[in-house]
Amino acid sequence: MACPRPLSQCDHTPLPGPPAGHWPLPLSRRRREMKSNKEQRSAVFVILFALITILILYSSSSANEVFHYGSLRGRTRRPVNLRKWSITDGYIPILGNKTLPSRCGQCVIVTSSSHLLGTKLGPEIERAECTIRMNDAPTTGYSADVGNKTTFRVVAHSSVFHVLRRPQEFVNRTPETVFIFWGPPNKMQKPQGSLVRVIQRAGLVFPNMEAYAISLSRMRQFDDLFRSETGKDREKSHSWLSTGWFTMVIAVELCDHVHVYGMVPPDYCSLRPHLQRMPYHYYEPKGPDECVTYIQNENSRKGNHHRFITEKRVFSSWAQLYGITFSHPSWT
Protein backbone atom coordinates (compact mmCIF):
# COMPACT_ATOMS: atom_id res chain seq x y z
CA MET A 1 0.00 0.00 0.00
CA ALA A 2 1.41 3.45 -0.92
CA CYS A 3 2.48 5.81 1.90
CA PRO A 4 0.14 8.90 2.00
CA ARG A 5 2.77 11.05 3.71
CA PRO A 6 5.89 12.68 2.24
CA LEU A 7 8.42 10.06 1.21
CA SER A 8 10.90 11.14 3.92
CA GLN A 9 8.33 10.37 6.65
CA CYS A 10 7.44 6.93 5.41
CA ASP A 11 8.68 3.77 7.09
CA HIS A 12 11.03 1.93 4.77
CA THR A 13 10.99 -1.34 6.75
CA PRO A 14 10.96 -4.11 4.17
CA LEU A 15 8.04 -6.44 3.97
CA PRO A 16 8.40 -9.89 5.51
CA GLY A 17 10.23 -12.26 3.25
CA PRO A 18 13.54 -13.95 2.80
CA PRO A 19 16.48 -11.99 4.25
CA ALA A 20 18.44 -9.95 1.76
CA GLY A 21 20.88 -12.07 -0.12
CA HIS A 22 19.08 -15.32 0.75
CA TRP A 23 17.27 -17.35 -1.85
CA PRO A 24 14.59 -19.98 -1.15
CA LEU A 25 15.99 -23.44 -0.35
CA PRO A 26 16.48 -25.74 -3.31
CA LEU A 27 13.56 -28.04 -3.97
CA SER A 28 15.57 -31.19 -3.22
CA ARG A 29 16.63 -29.86 0.19
CA ARG A 30 13.11 -28.81 1.04
CA ARG A 31 11.92 -32.30 0.16
CA ARG A 32 14.58 -33.84 2.41
CA GLU A 33 13.54 -31.62 5.30
CA MET A 34 9.86 -32.40 4.74
CA LYS A 35 10.70 -36.11 4.71
CA SER A 36 12.69 -35.72 7.91
CA ASN A 37 9.80 -33.90 9.60
CA LYS A 38 7.39 -36.59 8.44
CA GLU A 39 9.65 -39.32 9.84
CA GLN A 40 9.86 -37.47 13.16
CA ARG A 41 6.08 -37.19 13.31
CA SER A 42 5.78 -40.91 12.50
CA ALA A 43 8.24 -41.77 15.25
CA VAL A 44 6.29 -39.67 17.74
CA PHE A 45 3.07 -41.37 16.66
CA VAL A 46 4.63 -44.83 17.10
CA ILE A 47 5.89 -43.92 20.57
CA LEU A 48 2.49 -42.52 21.59
CA PHE A 49 0.74 -45.60 20.21
CA ALA A 50 3.10 -47.87 22.17
CA LEU A 51 2.51 -45.91 25.37
CA ILE A 52 -1.27 -46.00 24.91
CA THR A 53 -1.13 -49.75 24.22
CA ILE A 54 0.91 -50.32 27.37
CA LEU A 55 -1.58 -48.28 29.39
CA ILE A 56 -4.51 -50.25 27.96
CA LEU A 57 -2.83 -53.56 28.71
CA TYR A 58 -1.97 -52.42 32.21
CA SER A 59 -5.50 -51.20 32.78
CA SER A 60 -6.92 -54.47 31.45
CA SER A 61 -4.57 -56.45 33.64
CA SER A 62 -5.53 -54.40 36.68
CA ALA A 63 -9.21 -54.79 35.94
CA ASN A 64 -8.77 -58.53 35.54
CA GLU A 65 -6.53 -59.01 38.56
CA VAL A 66 -9.57 -60.61 40.14
CA PHE A 67 -8.56 -63.74 38.25
CA HIS A 68 -4.85 -63.68 39.10
CA TYR A 69 -5.57 -66.16 41.82
CA GLY A 70 -2.01 -66.86 42.92
CA SER A 71 -1.38 -63.25 43.98
CA LEU A 72 -4.74 -62.79 45.68
CA ARG A 73 -5.33 -65.66 48.00
CA GLY A 74 -4.19 -65.10 51.58
CA ARG A 75 -1.67 -67.85 52.28
CA THR A 76 -1.86 -67.55 56.03
CA ARG A 77 -5.61 -67.73 56.42
CA ARG A 78 -7.31 -70.84 57.77
CA PRO A 79 -9.16 -72.59 54.91
CA VAL A 80 -12.86 -73.31 55.15
CA ASN A 81 -13.56 -76.93 56.10
CA LEU A 82 -16.18 -77.96 53.57
CA ARG A 83 -16.78 -81.25 55.33
CA LYS A 84 -18.27 -79.39 58.26
CA TRP A 85 -21.00 -77.83 56.14
CA SER A 86 -24.45 -79.12 57.08
CA ILE A 87 -25.86 -81.30 54.31
CA THR A 88 -29.40 -81.22 55.70
CA ASP A 89 -29.48 -77.40 55.57
CA GLY A 90 -27.94 -77.14 52.12
CA TYR A 91 -30.15 -79.33 49.96
CA ILE A 92 -33.93 -79.11 49.85
CA PRO A 93 -35.91 -82.11 48.58
CA ILE A 94 -37.96 -81.23 45.51
CA LEU A 95 -39.71 -84.58 45.40
CA GLY A 96 -40.85 -86.11 48.69
CA ASN A 97 -39.25 -85.59 52.08
CA LYS A 98 -36.03 -87.52 51.71
CA THR A 99 -32.62 -86.38 52.91
CA LEU A 100 -29.63 -86.20 50.59
CA PRO A 101 -27.37 -89.25 51.11
CA SER A 102 -24.65 -88.02 53.40
CA ARG A 103 -21.53 -90.05 52.76
CA CYS A 104 -19.59 -91.96 50.10
CA GLY A 105 -16.13 -93.34 50.66
CA GLN A 106 -14.63 -93.16 47.17
CA CYS A 107 -16.20 -90.86 44.57
CA VAL A 108 -15.35 -90.10 40.98
CA ILE A 109 -16.30 -86.96 39.09
CA VAL A 110 -16.67 -87.64 35.38
CA THR A 111 -16.24 -84.31 33.65
CA SER A 112 -17.64 -83.53 30.21
CA SER A 113 -14.15 -83.09 28.75
CA SER A 114 -13.19 -84.51 25.36
CA HIS A 115 -9.95 -85.69 26.99
CA LEU A 116 -11.93 -88.76 28.06
CA LEU A 117 -12.51 -89.94 24.50
CA GLY A 118 -10.52 -93.06 23.69
CA THR A 119 -9.45 -93.68 27.30
CA LYS A 120 -11.52 -96.86 27.82
CA LEU A 121 -12.11 -95.78 31.42
CA GLY A 122 -15.68 -97.09 31.52
CA PRO A 123 -15.00 -100.26 33.57
CA GLU A 124 -12.84 -98.35 36.05
CA ILE A 125 -15.51 -95.68 36.54
CA GLU A 126 -18.18 -98.35 36.99
CA ARG A 127 -16.27 -99.79 39.97
CA ALA A 128 -16.35 -96.53 41.94
CA GLU A 129 -18.60 -96.39 44.99
CA CYS A 130 -20.22 -93.15 43.84
CA THR A 131 -20.10 -91.56 40.39
CA ILE A 132 -20.90 -87.88 39.84
CA ARG A 133 -21.74 -86.35 36.46
CA MET A 134 -22.74 -82.88 35.34
CA ASN A 135 -25.60 -81.30 33.41
CA ASP A 136 -26.68 -83.17 30.28
CA ALA A 137 -23.50 -85.17 29.64
CA PRO A 138 -24.79 -88.47 28.19
CA THR A 139 -23.39 -91.96 28.62
CA THR A 140 -25.18 -93.67 25.72
CA GLY A 141 -22.66 -94.18 22.96
CA TYR A 142 -19.76 -93.18 25.22
CA SER A 143 -19.92 -95.79 27.98
CA ALA A 144 -16.65 -97.45 26.94
CA ASP A 145 -14.86 -94.23 27.91
CA VAL A 146 -17.09 -92.69 30.59
CA GLY A 147 -19.12 -95.61 31.99
CA ASN A 148 -22.85 -95.64 32.73
CA LYS A 149 -23.13 -95.55 36.50
CA THR A 150 -24.48 -92.24 37.80
CA THR A 151 -24.99 -91.83 41.53
CA PHE A 152 -25.35 -88.05 41.47
CA ARG A 153 -25.97 -85.65 38.61
CA VAL A 154 -25.42 -81.95 39.35
CA VAL A 155 -27.55 -79.86 36.99
CA ALA A 156 -27.49 -76.10 36.39
CA HIS A 157 -30.72 -74.15 35.97
CA SER A 158 -29.80 -73.60 32.32
CA SER A 159 -29.64 -77.37 31.69
CA VAL A 160 -32.88 -78.44 33.42
CA PHE A 161 -34.87 -78.70 30.19
CA HIS A 162 -32.01 -80.43 28.37
CA VAL A 163 -32.13 -83.17 31.02
CA LEU A 164 -35.90 -83.52 31.37
CA ARG A 165 -36.47 -83.63 27.61
CA ARG A 166 -34.44 -86.85 27.45
CA PRO A 167 -35.79 -88.96 30.30
CA GLN A 168 -34.75 -92.22 28.65
CA GLU A 169 -31.14 -91.05 28.85
CA PHE A 170 -31.03 -89.26 32.17
CA VAL A 171 -33.88 -90.69 34.28
CA ASN A 172 -34.76 -94.20 33.15
CA ARG A 173 -31.29 -95.32 32.09
CA THR A 174 -29.90 -94.95 35.62
CA PRO A 175 -32.92 -94.92 37.97
CA GLU A 176 -30.65 -94.81 41.03
CA THR A 177 -29.45 -91.32 40.07
CA VAL A 178 -29.92 -88.51 42.60
CA PHE A 179 -30.34 -85.13 40.90
CA ILE A 180 -29.00 -81.97 42.52
CA PHE A 181 -30.23 -78.81 40.81
CA TRP A 182 -28.70 -75.40 41.36
CA GLY A 183 -29.60 -71.90 40.22
CA PRO A 184 -30.36 -68.37 41.39
CA PRO A 185 -33.67 -67.88 43.23
CA ASN A 186 -35.17 -65.87 40.36
CA LYS A 187 -34.73 -68.94 38.15
CA MET A 188 -35.46 -71.76 40.56
CA GLN A 189 -38.27 -70.37 42.70
CA LYS A 190 -39.88 -67.43 40.91
CA PRO A 191 -43.68 -67.31 41.42
CA GLN A 192 -44.59 -67.98 37.79
CA GLY A 193 -43.10 -70.94 35.96
CA SER A 194 -40.38 -71.81 38.45
CA LEU A 195 -37.97 -74.57 37.54
CA VAL A 196 -38.81 -76.27 40.83
CA ARG A 197 -42.40 -76.72 39.61
CA VAL A 198 -41.15 -78.09 36.30
CA ILE A 199 -39.05 -80.67 38.16
CA GLN A 200 -41.97 -81.53 40.43
CA ARG A 201 -44.18 -82.20 37.41
CA ALA A 202 -41.48 -84.47 36.01
CA GLY A 203 -41.51 -86.32 39.32
CA LEU A 204 -45.19 -87.13 38.82
CA VAL A 205 -44.31 -88.91 35.58
CA PHE A 206 -41.24 -90.60 37.04
CA PRO A 207 -42.14 -91.41 40.67
CA ASN A 208 -38.75 -92.99 41.39
CA MET A 209 -36.91 -89.80 40.50
CA GLU A 210 -35.01 -88.30 43.47
CA ALA A 211 -34.20 -84.60 43.22
CA TYR A 212 -32.91 -81.80 45.45
CA ALA A 213 -32.33 -78.08 45.01
CA ILE A 214 -29.48 -76.18 46.60
CA SER A 215 -30.96 -73.91 49.27
CA LEU A 216 -30.70 -70.14 49.18
CA SER A 217 -28.47 -70.10 52.27
CA ARG A 218 -26.15 -72.67 50.69
CA MET A 219 -26.00 -70.63 47.47
CA ARG A 220 -24.75 -67.72 49.58
CA GLN A 221 -22.15 -70.04 51.10
CA PHE A 222 -20.92 -70.92 47.62
CA ASP A 223 -20.52 -67.21 46.87
CA ASP A 224 -18.75 -66.61 50.17
CA LEU A 225 -16.43 -69.52 49.43
CA PHE A 226 -15.48 -67.99 46.07
CA ARG A 227 -14.68 -64.70 47.77
CA SER A 228 -12.72 -66.45 50.50
CA GLU A 229 -10.63 -68.42 48.02
CA THR A 230 -10.01 -65.71 45.41
CA GLY A 231 -10.24 -62.51 47.43
CA LYS A 232 -12.91 -61.13 45.10
CA ASP A 233 -16.66 -60.77 45.26
CA ARG A 234 -18.39 -62.93 42.67
CA GLU A 235 -21.05 -60.38 41.69
CA LYS A 236 -18.72 -57.37 41.63
CA SER A 237 -16.24 -59.28 39.49
CA HIS A 238 -19.05 -60.23 37.06
CA SER A 239 -18.47 -63.93 37.60
CA TRP A 240 -20.80 -66.90 37.38
CA LEU A 241 -19.89 -69.98 39.34
CA SER A 242 -19.69 -72.99 37.06
CA THR A 243 -21.41 -76.33 37.53
CA GLY A 244 -17.90 -77.69 38.08
CA TRP A 245 -17.54 -75.43 41.13
CA PHE A 246 -20.77 -76.72 42.66
CA THR A 247 -19.91 -80.30 41.77
CA MET A 248 -16.47 -80.17 43.35
CA VAL A 249 -17.78 -78.70 46.60
CA ILE A 250 -20.63 -81.23 46.76
CA ALA A 251 -18.15 -84.06 46.16
CA VAL A 252 -15.93 -82.86 48.99
CA GLU A 253 -18.97 -82.63 51.26
CA LEU A 254 -20.19 -86.14 50.46
CA CYS A 255 -17.00 -88.10 49.79
CA ASP A 256 -13.91 -89.12 51.72
CA HIS A 257 -11.80 -89.24 48.55
CA VAL A 258 -12.48 -87.71 45.14
CA HIS A 259 -11.00 -88.76 41.79
CA VAL A 260 -11.62 -86.32 38.93
CA TYR A 261 -11.44 -87.60 35.37
CA GLY A 262 -10.81 -85.28 32.43
CA MET A 263 -10.22 -81.92 34.13
CA VAL A 264 -7.18 -80.06 32.78
CA PRO A 265 -4.80 -78.13 35.09
CA PRO A 266 -5.06 -74.34 35.35
CA ASP A 267 -1.97 -73.72 33.19
CA TYR A 268 -2.98 -76.18 30.48
CA CYS A 269 -4.03 -73.63 27.87
CA SER A 270 -0.80 -71.65 28.20
CA LEU A 271 1.23 -74.81 27.49
CA ARG A 272 -0.94 -76.55 24.88
CA PRO A 273 0.25 -76.39 21.25
CA HIS A 274 -1.75 -73.68 19.53
CA LEU A 275 -2.69 -75.85 16.56
CA GLN A 276 -4.13 -78.63 18.71
CA ARG A 277 -7.90 -78.38 18.98
CA MET A 278 -9.95 -80.14 21.67
CA PRO A 279 -13.75 -79.91 21.83
CA TYR A 280 -15.06 -78.50 25.08
CA HIS A 281 -17.49 -81.43 25.53
CA TYR A 282 -16.85 -85.04 24.59
CA TYR A 283 -20.40 -85.32 23.21
CA GLU A 284 -20.09 -82.23 20.98
CA PRO A 285 -17.21 -82.97 18.58
CA LYS A 286 -18.00 -79.86 16.52
CA GLY A 287 -18.53 -77.67 19.57
CA PRO A 288 -16.26 -74.86 20.75
CA ASP A 289 -12.60 -75.43 21.52
CA GLU A 290 -11.93 -75.90 25.22
CA CYS A 291 -9.06 -73.40 25.52
CA VAL A 292 -10.92 -70.75 23.54
CA THR A 293 -13.83 -71.23 25.95
CA TYR A 294 -11.61 -71.10 29.04
CA ILE A 295 -9.60 -68.06 28.00
CA GLN A 296 -12.55 -66.03 26.73
CA ASN A 297 -14.47 -66.64 29.95
CA GLU A 298 -11.46 -65.95 32.14
CA ASN A 299 -10.52 -62.63 30.55
CA SER A 300 -13.90 -61.15 29.60
CA ARG A 301 -14.95 -58.10 31.57
CA LYS A 302 -18.29 -57.35 29.90
CA GLY A 303 -21.24 -59.35 31.12
CA ASN A 304 -21.00 -62.33 33.44
CA HIS A 305 -18.68 -65.23 32.75
CA HIS A 306 -17.43 -68.43 34.31
CA ARG A 307 -13.87 -68.16 35.60
CA PHE A 308 -12.84 -71.70 34.77
CA ILE A 309 -9.09 -71.19 35.13
CA THR A 310 -9.45 -69.45 38.48
CA GLU A 311 -11.67 -72.27 39.73
CA LYS A 312 -9.07 -74.84 38.69
CA ARG A 313 -6.44 -72.99 40.71
CA VAL A 314 -8.70 -73.23 43.72
CA PHE A 315 -9.26 -76.95 43.11
CA SER A 316 -5.51 -77.45 42.92
CA SER A 317 -5.13 -75.88 46.35
CA TRP A 318 -7.80 -78.23 47.71
CA ALA A 319 -6.17 -81.40 46.35
CA GLN A 320 -4.03 -82.22 49.37
CA LEU A 321 -6.47 -80.76 51.87
CA TYR A 322 -9.41 -82.92 50.79
CA GLY A 323 -7.78 -85.91 49.12
CA ILE A 324 -8.58 -84.96 45.51
CA THR A 325 -6.71 -86.57 42.61
CA PHE A 326 -6.85 -85.63 38.94
CA SER A 327 -6.21 -87.87 35.95
CA HIS A 328 -6.54 -87.84 32.17
CA PRO A 329 -4.61 -85.59 32.35
CA SER A 330 -2.83 -86.17 35.67
CA TRP A 331 -1.88 -83.16 37.77
CA THR A 332 -2.02 -81.86 41.34
Swiss-Prot record:
Residue ranges for the region (Disordered) are 1-26
| Annotated TM spans | 43-63
Which positions does UniProt annotate with glycan attachment?
A: N97
EC no. given is 2.4.99.-
Domain of life of the native organism = Eukaryota
Tell me which parts of the chain lie in the Lumenal compartment. 64-332
InterPro entries cross-referenced by the UniProt entry: Glyco_trans_29 (IPR001675), GT29-like_sf (IPR038578)
**A molecular function (GO) term:** alpha-N-acetylgalactosaminide alpha-2,6-sialyltransferase activity
Q: Which Gene3D superfamilies match?
A: Glycosyl transferase family 29
Name the UniProt key words of this record, in alphabetical order.
Disulfide bond, Glycoprotein, Glycosyltransferase, Golgi apparatus, Lipid metabolism, Membrane, Sialic acid, Signal-anchor, Transferase, Transmembrane, Transmembrane helix
Q: Name one Pfam family in it.
A: Glyco_transf_29
Provide the membrane topology annotation: Single-pass type II membrane protein
The set of disulfide-linked cysteines is C107-C255
* Predominant location: Golgi
This protein's GO cellular component annotations are: Golgi membrane
What is this enzyme's catalytic activity, as reactions?
a ganglioside GM1b (d18:1(4E)) + CMP-N-acetyl-beta-neuraminate = a ganglioside GD1alpha (d18:1(4E)) + CMP + H(+); N-acetyl-alpha-neuraminosyl-(2->3)-beta-D-galactosyl-(1->3)-N-acetyl-beta-D-glucosaminyl-(1->3)-beta-D-galactosyl-(1->4)-beta-D-glucosyl-(1<->1')-N-acyl-sphing-4-enine + CMP-N-acetyl-beta-neuraminate = N-acetyl-alpha-neuraminosyl-(2->3)-beta-D-galactosyl-(1->3)-[N-acetyl-alpha-neuraminosyl-(2->6)]-N-acetyl-beta-D-glucosaminyl-(1->3)-beta-D-galactosyl-(1->4)-beta-D-glucosyl-(1<->1')-N-acyl-sphing-4-enine + CMP + H(+); a globoside MSGG + CMP-N-acetyl-beta-neuraminate = a globoside DSGG + CMP + H(+); a ganglioside GD1a (d18:1(4E)) + CMP-N-acetyl-beta-neuraminate = a ganglioside GT1aalpha (d18:1(4E)) + CMP + H(+)
Compartment(s): Golgi apparatus membrane
GO BP, sorted A to Z? ganglioside biosynthetic process; oligosaccharide metabolic process; protein glycosylation
Topology, Cytoplasmic side: 1-42
Say which family it is in: Belongs to the glycosyltransferase 29 family.
Role noted for this protein: Transfers the sialyl group (N-acetyl-alpha-neuraminyl or NeuAc) from CMP-NeuAc onto glycoproteins and glycolipids, forming an alpha-2,6-linkage. Produces branched type disialyl structures by transfer of a sialyl group onto the GalNAc or GlcNAc residue inside backbone core chains having a terminal sialic acid with an alpha-2,3-linkage on Gal. ST6GalNAcVI prefers glycolipids to glycoproteins, predominantly catalyzing the biosynthesis of ganglioside GD1alpha from GM1b.
Q: What is this protein called?
A: Alpha-N-acetylgalactosaminide alpha-2,6-sialyltransferase 6
Species source reads Bos taurus (Bovine)
